[in-house]
Amino acid sequence: MSTTLAKPAEMADRKWYVIDAAGKPLGRVAAKAAVILRGKNKTTFTPNVDCGDHVIIINCDEAVLTGKKLEKKFHRTHSGWIGRLKETQYKTLMAENSDKAMTYAVKGMVPSNTIGTKAMTRLHCYKAADHAHAAQKPEAVEI
């Protein structure tokens, strides 16, 4: 039995998908976006080829965190210098930069290599319902 592998030239035609995050858990939206960005929803998925599609996430302001995660969960960044750990509570992160919170969640779900880096360039997060990609005619994805 032979396995058909996708070639990078075959993956040039990428689709656009839009996900509405209003009232949905942040992690579930991020997980669905990561699957599409990686290309795992396709029958022609090949692990060493970047075969993912574009994902637009709208209404990031209305995404919810379940339980007590708003108060107890932190986003941590470290500059590499001693004592330079910065912690941001998700309550303030969701209030100020909800699109960044969604981006951080998706980034943690894609591989940390060149394919994951390319996949993250195809992620477009917006706080409100309007976006600048209507000309691409994105398909709606239900969660």
Please tell me what each predicted stretch does.
Residues T103, V110-A132:
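C-terminal structural segments of small proteins and small subunits
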Residues M1-Y104, T114, A132-I143:
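Ribosome large-subunit tunnel/peptidyl-transferase-proximal elements
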